[in-house]
């Protein structure tokens, strides 16, 4: 019953706040990445908390609940960071063993104060098991080196969750990087559907935020 109510409220909200014409306005206004006022309302609706566990003050509606929202957003071609910052990033953050970091990031995602993008793809073909980006231990941090492509909403994100080969065990790890860290170069682009993405180069960026998740 709660899932049905969520779907109904989402449909009504988007019909009122995000008609198909909204995408055209963003597209024709210098490729604006998303409507910030609309995003604020989505946060207030609780959509950013849908898949976050109650332990972290989330709504714990699961992927079925979030799927209801994404389905309706797809019908209206609604542009927002919910795919990158909520679906993709929250899922990977949940894998971390660092509870204090998880609590902090989940809170920032839920209140909309921070946006997070996943940086994983390295070429034109999706191959999640292959990465040329490397992560090496260096004193009190890590050295990250490599290039990522097609980073969704990379131009507006505060953090990147980056996949890399851990030099110590050759396994794929994920780590959190401040988007403004020294040694990161951004090349922002626009998809044919007017959505923005970035190609990002990490050149000896020192990570102090947390141990990588393996």
List each language-model region with its residue ranges:
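N-terminal glycine-rich flavin-associated loop
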Residues: 78-100
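A short, Trp-centered hydrophobic/proline-enriched beta-strand micro-motif
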Residues: 112-123
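A short core secondary-structure module
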Residues: 119, 147-185
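Residue-level detector of conserved catalytic or cofactor/ligand-binding positions
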Residues: 205-213
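Amphipathic, small/basic residue-rich leader segments at the start of a protein or domain
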Residues: 1-83, 104
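A generic, well-ordered mixed alpha/beta core segment in the N-terminal half of proteins
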Residues: 97-113
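Flexible, small-/acidic-enriched active-site or ligand-binding loops
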Residues: 130-132, 150-151, 178-206
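Short glycine/proline-enriched turns and hinge-like loops at secondary-structure junctions
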Residues: 61, 127-130, 153-157
């Amino acid at each position: 019953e709660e899932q049905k109510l969520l779907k109904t409220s989402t449909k009504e909200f988007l019909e009122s706040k995000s008609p198909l014409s909204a995408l055209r306005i963003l597209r024709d206004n210098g490729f604006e990445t998303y409507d910030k006022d609309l995003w604020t309302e989505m946060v207030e609706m609780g959509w950013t908390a849908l898949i976050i566990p109650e332990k972290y003050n989330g709504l714990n509606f699961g992927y079925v609940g979030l799927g209801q929202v994404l389905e309706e957003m797809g019908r209206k071609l609604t542009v927002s960071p919910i795919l990158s910052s909520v679906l993709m990033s929250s899922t990977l953050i949940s894998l971390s063993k660092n509870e204090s970091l998880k609590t902090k990031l989940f809170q920032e995602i839920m209140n909309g104060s921070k946006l997070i993008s996943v940086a994983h793809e390295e070429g034109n073909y999706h191959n999640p098991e292959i990465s040329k980006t490397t992560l090496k231990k260096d004193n009190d941090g890590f050295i990250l080196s490599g290039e990522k492509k097609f980073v969704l909403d990379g131009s507006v994100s505060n953090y990147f969750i980056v996949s890399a080969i851990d030099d110590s065990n050759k396994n794929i790890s994920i780590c959190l990087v401040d988007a403004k860290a020294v040694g990161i170069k951004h090349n922002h682009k626009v998809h044919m559907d007017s959505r923005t993405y970035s190609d990002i180069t990490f050149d000896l960026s020192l990570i102090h935020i947390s141990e990588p998740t393996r």
